[in-house]
């Protein structure tokens, strides 16, 4: 089949590779004129990295990314609440990777061009809409002209034009008041060089992790960090810029944080470029598929970045879509794909609104009142593991059966 994909992000490119592997003719259309390796840190969870390994990208990932050993959840005083392992040594079939989002996107882009041809990704083509009938779908562009295909996959992100046409009466983005500041800084490594720290609580939170294997080989660490501050009276989401240069007033919220190996205020102050944006998602959709058109990735299920799951769910979408179309070509395959993925991602979106695996931070914050308190006296390991295991079940990354 000839399949058009709107969007050359991680989901759209992963779908291109998976669909090409099944013998389909794929054409990707990207709105921006020039693709650039934008973004900062991203995580690929074990279940999603298995898809990329299956596509033959494991060696390339190991050359650029960090194999995450564990996520350490800590109080603002530095207490270790829980260490949640994410590595093959802990029983996962594939590793979790922490890496630069742009490097992952360009790894996928290079592979698409190498396997499908240089013209497989057309930049400067914003998909603006579509029409369809029993025999095919016609894709239209903001720049004019059209493209005929058997299927259209809307992988065009948070502001998806394909989603907009499928659900024209959808309400505004969902925003509860958390602002996020992000940056990356090259510095000395912390911990073992493979650990992610998440500290604080639902109101004030700090996340950091290394994202570059190449920096590690030079004895340094490229540290990706995210600072989150929740406001009691948030402004409307539509008034909040998606991404802009961030102010530095938020740093005052983290002056009292105490982390082993990390001086958080110093890390924040030494970062040259800081971006700021609201934490936004959308309400889950009742359906993704209409005839020969379906949604994928952020276009289908934008979610809060709890559990580092957004890109991973898009990659899983790509594999399930290709497998479903291999069994049932055409609209029936799209419906089969949705039947598998929509319930899972809906559950993830709603769980992430409740903080996902990061609920352990709020459990600890409610009980730990100062640096002298002992976590082991206040919270049982079983209570913490229940949170972690529950989210692994929801998100679909389970350890191998022993």
Predicted regions and their residues:
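Short, flexible helix/strand-to-coil boundary loops that buttress conserved ligand/catalytic motifs
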Residues: 39, 55-56, 65, 84-85, ...
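Residues at the starts of beta-strands that form the adenosine-phosphate
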Residues: 2, 25, 222
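C-terminal helical "tail/cap" subdomain of flavin- and related membrane-associated enzymes
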Residues: 1, 63, 78, 286, ...
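Conserved N-terminal helical subregion
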Residues: 1-3, 20, 45-167, 171-184, ...
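Conserved FAD/dinucleotide-binding core of flavoprotein oxidoreductases
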Residues: 82-105, 136, 142-147, 186-273
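Catalytic P-loop NTPase motifs of RecA-like helicase/translocase cores
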Residues: 35-36, 161-162, 302-304
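Conserved mid-domain beta->alpha element of the FAD-binding
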Residues: 6-21, 25-32, 153-154, 181, ...
């Amino acid at each position: 089949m000839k399949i058009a994909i709107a969007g050359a992000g991680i989901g759209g490119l992963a779908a291109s590779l998976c669909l090409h592997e099944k013998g389909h003719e794929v054409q990707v259309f990207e709105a921006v004129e020039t693709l650039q390796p934008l973004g900062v840190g991203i995580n690929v969870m074990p279940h999603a990295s298995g898809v990329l390994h299956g596509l033959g990208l494991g060696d390339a990932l190991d050359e650029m990314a960090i194999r995450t050993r564990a996520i350490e959840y800590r109080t603002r005083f530095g207490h270790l609440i829980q260490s949640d392992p994410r590595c093959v040594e802990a029983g996962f079939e594939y590793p979790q990777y922490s890496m630069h989002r742009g490097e992952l996107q360009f790894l996928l882009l290079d592979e698409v061009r190498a396997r499908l041809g240089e013209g497989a990704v057309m930049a400067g083509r914003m998909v603006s809409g579509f029409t369809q009938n029993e025999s095919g779908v016609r894709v239209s562009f903001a720049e004019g002209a059209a493209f005929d295909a058997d299927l259209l996959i809307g992988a065009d992100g948070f502001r998806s034009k394909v989603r907009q046409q499928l659900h024209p009466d959808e309400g505004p983005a969902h925003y509860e008041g958390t602002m996020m500041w992000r940056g990356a800084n090259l510095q000395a490594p912390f911990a073992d060089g493979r650990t992610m720290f998440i500290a604080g609580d639902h109101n004030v939170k700090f996340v950091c992790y290394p994202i570059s294997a190449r920096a590690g080989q030079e004895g340094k660490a490229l540290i990706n960090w995210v600072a989150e501050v929740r406001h009691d009276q948030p402004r409307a989401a539509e008034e909040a810029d998606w991404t802009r240069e961030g102010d530095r007033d938020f740093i005052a919220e983290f002056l009292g944080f105490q982390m082993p190996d990390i001086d958080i205020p110093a890390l924040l102050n030494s970062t040259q470029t800081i971006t700021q944006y609201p934490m936004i998602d959308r309400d889950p959709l009742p359906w993704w598929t209409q005839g020969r058109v379906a949604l994928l990735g952020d276009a289908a299920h934008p979610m809060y970045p709890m559990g580092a799951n957004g890109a991973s769910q898009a990659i899983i979408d790509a594999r399930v879509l290709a497998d479903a179309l291999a069994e049932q070509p055409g609209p029936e395959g799209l419906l089969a794909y949705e039947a598998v993925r929509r319930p899972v991602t809906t559950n993830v979106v709603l769980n992430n609104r409740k903080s996902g695996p990061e609920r352990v931070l709020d459990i600890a914050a409610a009980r730990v009142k100062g640096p002298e308190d002992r976590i082991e006296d206040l919270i049982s390991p079983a209570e913490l593991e229940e949170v972690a295991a529950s989210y692994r079940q929801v998100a679909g990354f389970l350890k191998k059966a022993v």
